[in-house]
Amino acid sequence: MNALLSNPFKERLRKGEVQIGLWLSSTTSYMAEIAATSGYDWLLIDGEHAPNTIQDLYHQLQAVAPYASQPVIRPVEASKSLIKQVLDIGAQTLLIPMVDTADQARQVVSATRYPPYGERGVGASVARAARWGRIENYMAHVNDSLCLLVQVESKTALDNLDEILGVEGIDGVFIGPADLSASLGYPDNAGHPEVQRIIETSIRRIRAAGKAAGFLAVAPDMAQQCLAWGANFVAVGVDTMLYSDALDQRLAMFKSGKNGPRVKGSY
């Protein structure tokens, strides 16, 4: 494979290695580059809940490219045209939100593959992903470097988890704790014992199926628990939350009556 098409994040998942990540919601290439120099294994650049345009995502991919931290792009939705754009700007690993059924998972796989294996539009000659046509035989080899992760974050998705896990082309499944807990009837309470039980069993089912299991845990003890359950790509913080906490802590050192860091149990 051409070295430009290698995907260390995917290779480590295949080996079952644990990878520790950070969620990026700040939407700036400057903050993304700072995060990339910190040594996290992967960085989730969020296009779902953060106000990132396709240009913002592009600039953040450029910013982290010189560093070892591997970027993961989460588009706002699983639209075929948006997935095409995100892949063309050079994303190799995608996290697709709100995948509830095996049919939806198959549609996502198809959107990432060129014909005859899928429906991805052909435009390698004008795409950063193919270095504007300079990567020889890009279309023939790109599938090997693509890593596709889907989010299971509803009761419907849990009911269909085994079928989703059976879809060829899905490399991993990410448990979305905030939406999942709300769907189960425990909004803003991912720490509820029933939610925790379901998270544990889901992670174990994902790993038993030979797929990578992912999670976002802003509380360190929850991150450690998910790792103990077998999750092997875990984000342990969100840049905007860490930044706001650091600001609060510093101000509290100098102004009486100011609160310390906020207690945050979920994203």
From Swiss-Prot:
HAMAP family: KDR_aldolase (MF_01290). The record marks D88 as: Increases basicity of active site His. This is 2-keto-3-deoxy-L-rhamnonate aldolase. Belongs to the HpcH/HpaI aldolase family. KDR aldolase subfamily. The active site is at H49. PANTHER family: 2-KETO-3-DEOXY-L-RHAMNONATE ALDOLASE. GO terms for cellular component: cytoplasm. Mg(2+) binds at E153, D179. Homohexamer.
